[in-house]
Amino acid sequence: MPEITIQELFDRMPEAFLPEKAGDVDAVIQFHLSGEEGGDWAVTLRDQKCVVEDDIVVENPTMTLTADAQDYKNVILGKMDPMAAFMQQKLKLKGNLNLALGLLKYFKMD
């Protein structure tokens, strides 16, 4: 079975979103991913909903995550520890870092 693509990961985010875990989060997260499957995505978490926009760069996001697409995919799929990826600068974060700490909890990962 082929490995999931980055686009599929983003497409699945709204259905994997756990509003009960996110609570009253109100944030826009900009993803800048480089490499073979790279691109720009904006994920808005607001009013207990998750909205994903493809091929967009937003002004003044709450947080920006920059990474190689494969490294990001490895974190999401549990093949790479998120904290280790951050410490090794494979994931670069700018903005509200508390949001980054909670982000993985807001989504069903199976």
Which residues fall in each region the model found?
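Feature captures hydrophobic
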Residues: 1-110
